[in-house]
């Protein structure tokens, strides 16, 4: 069967070959070309059928080819087998023949015809155009990046940015082209030219120009140094005058005025010695000015100007000073000139020195440190003692001049007795000081205390003497008045209190003053103390026993800081120091109660807090409407049941911040005015919120900063000069350089978009 099939196939193949020969010998048409393609397909099927005749696949034996000298048509070399066959290679042998011109035209027509690509979508085309336009505009705008960055980082911008060159042209160049136009200007210039006057005001005169040309470099340097020195001295004198003008001390101005008067007198004396005639003329001028001032009263603040200044003197400091200067000038002019000799000046100086007593100098030497309060009190006591001493040492001539002092013989005897008592007390105190040597007090403090004791005793004695003399005179004149009251300070007992705890003065009658001598004669006897002191002893007996041994001390910083505030029970009784803490707290509470007795501050505060809490609470919504489901009208209220039904309770809000703070009210309302000044976005120069907060926390007011720093902090960001035209900036004004972003091409800046376009083009071409 297989052989029969094979023979049939061979017969069919042979017939097909014959047909192929016929077709090759005759020209082919278009229909014949289609049939030829079908024959090739059939021939291919025949070969496949022949290959499948044997069920077994034959082994292909390897063939070996060797190079030989003879080349036959059956042995073709395989050179260039890897290269592709081009259409030009096939058309090469057909060129000389003209019969194949039509075939050549057909082939060239087929070669020239190509498939056209599909056009892009309209949106894609517009996107590409936008990218190209963006690249061009970004390249042009990037030239201004440096300028914009510089203007943003600048602390202050001053427009116009172009600064006009400041050139100082001399007046000759300015008026060179100017001409007189009006008839008045022409007449003025004609007069100037006729008289050969300079029309302009040159900086340097011809003489100065000649001197500059004649001056050498060294002379110019010396001249400049002299001018600099003169300017410096002038500035020093001006600063000194300003400082002296600001001094408000009356004593200083009095001394300056005295010095000026003395200097004027000395100059006048010198002028009188040198030129008597000129001195007489000067004296006549001064006397004439004094007379004119006394007649006219020009500087007595009685004119229109002075009255207008007097109205504003209460508010204006300059007006007040002007009025004072007027009065001072009036006093100076109306004062008669008195020439004081040198002997009188020396005598006046001696008198001033004699006014200072010796005891004041002694106290100043013994005083520890510059304590002006103690020195002032010492000087006051010393002056009183000095007056008493002067009254004792009056000469006989003074006694004759004052016959009224003849009655003072009796008080002098009493004074001697008091001085003796003073000596006794001083000796007793010295002994007590020797016994109390173990106390932690320095030698200097003891000296100060003794000096203070002496001064206080002298003061008390002098007061006693003067008041007793005064009372004795009054008793002689009016003996019926026996209850006159005088101010008198209690004499210091043995247990001297500190200066801070001294008792105030109180009134004493004449009977008490008569018994004063008896009490002074018994220094060791204890006097009855007030009732408050007894209560203090009962409360704290230990402190009272210690206080007996203490003596009068100066002000000490440690004692002042450690002592508590005393509780004053009565103004006429001595103050007591409460050492118990509960007593001090009770007194403080009592004082606060007395201060706020009429005002119930706590209740008002609690009421205000309750109102604030109620105002901030979420309120319920009442949806009841009158007339719905029941009668409505005037004076008809909806029932409570209906209200409860239509009442929507609001949810409770978060707890208040001041819930556990009874003494504080914290407002939780949002302040709209403050919210307008809050910043939601971080400003440009700052990179972190802490930097911005730190700058906001710093104060910029003039209270906390210097004037220069305040002006710098509050300087405006942009300043425009008035009257100047602000023109737009151009590329010629600024050296603009393009930034690196413009160098990147458009397609490179977005490669994904570019690849997307390429894929779409390929798909369209394949389709």
From Swiss-Prot:
Q: Where is this cross-link: Glycyl lysine isopeptide (Lys-Gly) (interchain with G-Cter in SUMO2)?
A: 122, 447, 518
A GO biological-process term: rRNA processing
Nucleus keyword on record: yes
Give the chief site where it resides.
nucleus
- This protein's name: U3 small nucleolar RNA-associated protein 14 homolog A
Alphabetical list of InterPro entries matching this protein: SSU_processome_Utp14
Q: What is the lineage of its organism?
A: Eukaryota, Metazoa, Chordata, Craniata, Vertebrata
Task: Supply one GO CC term from the record.
Answer: nucleolus
Source species: Mus musculus (Mouse)
Where it sits in the cell: the answer is: Nucleus, Nucleolus
């Amino acid at each position: 069967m297989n052989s029969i099939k094979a023979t049939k196939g061979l017969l069919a193949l042979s017939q097909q070959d014959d047909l192929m020969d016929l077709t090759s010998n005759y020209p082919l048409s278009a229909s014949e070309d289609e049939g030829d393609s079908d024959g090739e397909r059939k021939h291919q099927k025949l070969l496949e059928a022949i290959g499948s005749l044997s069920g077994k696949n034959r082994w292909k034996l390897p063939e070996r080819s060797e190079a030989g000298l003879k080349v036959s048509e059956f042995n073709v070399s395989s050179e260039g087998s890897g290269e592709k066959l081009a259409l030009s290679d096939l058309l090469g042998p057909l060129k000389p023949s003209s019969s194949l011109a039509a075939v050549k035209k057909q082939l060239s027509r087929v070669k020239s015809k190509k498939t056209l690509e599909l056009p892009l979508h309209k949106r894609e085309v517009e996107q590409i155009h936008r990218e190209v336009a963006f690249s061009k505009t970004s390249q042009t705008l990037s030239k201004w990046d440096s300028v914009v960055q510089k203007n943003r980082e600048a602390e202050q911008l001053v427009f116009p940015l172009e600064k006009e060159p400041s050139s100082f042209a001399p007046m000759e160049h300015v008026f060179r082209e100017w001409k007189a136009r009006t008839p008045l200007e022409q007449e003025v210039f004609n007069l100037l030219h006729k008289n050969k006057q300079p029309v302009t005001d040159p900086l340097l005169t011809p003489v100065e120009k000649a001197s500059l040309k004649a001056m050498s470099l060294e002379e110019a340097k010396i001249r400049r140094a002299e001018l600099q020195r003169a300017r410096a001295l002038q500035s020093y004198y001006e600063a000194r005058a300003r400082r002296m003008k600001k001094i408000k001390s009356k004593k200083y101005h009095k001394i300056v005025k005295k010095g000026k008067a003395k200097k004027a007198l000395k100059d006048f004396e010198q002028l009188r010695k040198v030129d008597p005639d000129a001195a007489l003329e000067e004296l006549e001028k001064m006397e004439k000015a004094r007379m004119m001032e006394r007649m006219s009263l020009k500087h007595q603040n009685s004119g229109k100007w002075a009255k207008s200044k007097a109205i504003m003197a209460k508010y204006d400091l300059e007006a007040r000073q002007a009025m004072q200067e007027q009065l001072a000038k009036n006093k100076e002019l109306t004062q008669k000139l008195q020439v004081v000799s040198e002997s009188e000046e020396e005598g006046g100086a001696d008198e001033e020195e004699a006014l200072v007593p010796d005891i004041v100098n002694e106290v100043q030497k013994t005083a520890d440190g510059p304590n002006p309060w103690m020195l002032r009190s010492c000087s006051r006591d010393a002056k009183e003692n000095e007056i008493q001493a002067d009254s004792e040492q009056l000469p006989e001539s003074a006694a004759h001049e004052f016959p009224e002092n003849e009655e003072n013989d009796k008080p002098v005897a009493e004074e001697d007795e008091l001085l003796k008592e003073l000596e006794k007390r001083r000796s007793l105190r010295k002994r007590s000081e020797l016994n109390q040597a173990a106390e932690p007090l320095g030698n200097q403090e003891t000296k100060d205390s003794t000096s203070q004791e002496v001064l206080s005793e002298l003061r008390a004695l002098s007061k006693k003497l003067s008041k007793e003399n005064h009372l004795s005179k009054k008793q002689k004149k009016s003996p019926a008045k026996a209850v006159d009251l005088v101010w008198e300070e209690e004499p210091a007992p043995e247990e001297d209190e500190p200066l801070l705890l001294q008792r105030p003065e109180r009134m004493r009658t004449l009977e008490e003053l008569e018994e004063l001598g008896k009490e002074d004669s018994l220094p060791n006897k204890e006097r009855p103390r007030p009732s408050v002191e007894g209560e203090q002893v009962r409360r704290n007996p230990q402190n009272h026993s210690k206080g007996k041994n203490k003596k009068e001390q100066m002000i000490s910083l440690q004692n002042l800081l450690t002592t508590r505030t005393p509780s004053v029970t009565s103004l006429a009784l001595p103050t007591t120091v409460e050492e118990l803490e509960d007593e001090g707290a009770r007194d403080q509470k009592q004082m606060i109660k007395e201060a706020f007795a009429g005002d119930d501050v706590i209740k008002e505060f609690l009421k205000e807090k309750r109102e604030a809490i109620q105002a901030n609470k979420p309120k319920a919504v009442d949806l009841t409407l009158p007339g719905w489901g029941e009668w409505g009208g005037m004076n008809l209220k909806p029932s409570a049941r209906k209200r409860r039904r239509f009442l929507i309770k609001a949810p409770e809000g978060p707890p208040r911040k001041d819930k556990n703070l009874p003494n504080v009210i914290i407002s939780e309302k949002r302040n709209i005015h403050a919210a307008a000044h809050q910043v939601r976005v971080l400003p440009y120069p700052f990179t972190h919120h802490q930097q911005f907060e730190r700058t906001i926390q710093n104060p910029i007011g003039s209270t906390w900063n210097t004037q220069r720093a305040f002006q710098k902090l509050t300087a405006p960001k942009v300043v425009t000069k008035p009257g100047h035209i602000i023109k737009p900036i151009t590329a010629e004004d600024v050296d603009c350089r393009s930034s690196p972003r413009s160098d990147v091409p458009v397609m490179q800046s977005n490669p994904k978009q570019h690849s997307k376009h390429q894929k779409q083009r390929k798909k369209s071409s394949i389709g």
